Amino acid sequence: KVIDAGKYAAFLRNLPFISVPTSSSSDGFSSASASLLVHGKRTSVPARLAYGIIVDTQVIRTAPEKFIYSGIGDMISKITALYDWIYEEKCGYSEVNDFAVMIAKKAVNSFVRTPYESIKDELFLKELVDSLAMSGIANEIAGSSAPTSGSEHLISHALDKILEIPQLHGIQVGIATYIMSKVQDHRYVRVETVLRETGFFDYAATLKMKRDDFIKAIDMAPSIKPFRHTYLHEENYREAAKKLVLEDEVLSKILV
């Protein structure tokens, strides 16, 4: 990925980095980390936060719809990620930065409340890109990815290791967000509504992702970031997540 390589090169050379994304598939165009292939496996490495971001929504609109769905999945994940971070602080494993929380919350709330008729509407794409960009800023303020990456991202990172050919990051994250929102019992109606009404679930169902892979990923999730303490770092919540994968009505139409 050009942006990831550019961010990492800027980090190594200590140079300013201007991000010009051509799709809205994730918040990667604004974050201070890069996803690179290392020995054939996708790996997160430190990178340079964008000095500036230039986005042409006409270009974003012409990208395949799967990239928009991926961006939707990555954006909605801030709901469960923030809840994980707050839970982590309650358990004594972290210290929440309230300003970073405020920015990440405003980003996701602005997005989910945007009126639209099509995911290719100008306003919808603008809000999606703006909100994804704000996510990167929240991470920079927090000094970590905690405001925007929680248990749902751990499932996706585990899938990256399990699958020979992983799906788009935001697609995996979106499904994992639905799972974790129900495990957390937190805003799951909002998450389900957004993913259903945008067509995300319908698209995800065409990919024929496997239940067994998600179950393996849930078990593997804590080992991805052992220094964190998300809901999935506790066995009872892992069991609840796996039960959902096997029994949830929505997931029964998506996973095979």
Where are these regions (language model features)?
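N-terminal small/polar loop signature for handling phosphorylated ligands or for N-terminal nucleophile
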Residues: 1-18, 117-125
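Short glycine/serine/threonine-rich phosphate/pyrophosphate-binding segments
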Residues: 1-8, 26-29, 148
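Generic enzyme active-site microenvironment
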Residues: 2, 54, 151
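Generic hydrophobic alpha-helical membrane-span motif
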Residues: 6, 27, 62, 158-159
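A glycine/threonine-rich phosphate-anchoring loop and its flanking beta-alpha core
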Residues: 11-107
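C-terminal charged capping/lid subdomain of soluble metabolic enzymes
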Residues: 75, 185-256
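Short helix-capping/linker segments at secondary-structure and domain boundaries
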Residues: 79-88, 143-146, 183-190, 227-229
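Active-site segments that bind and position negatively charged phosphate/pyrophosphate groups
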Residues: 99-202, 209
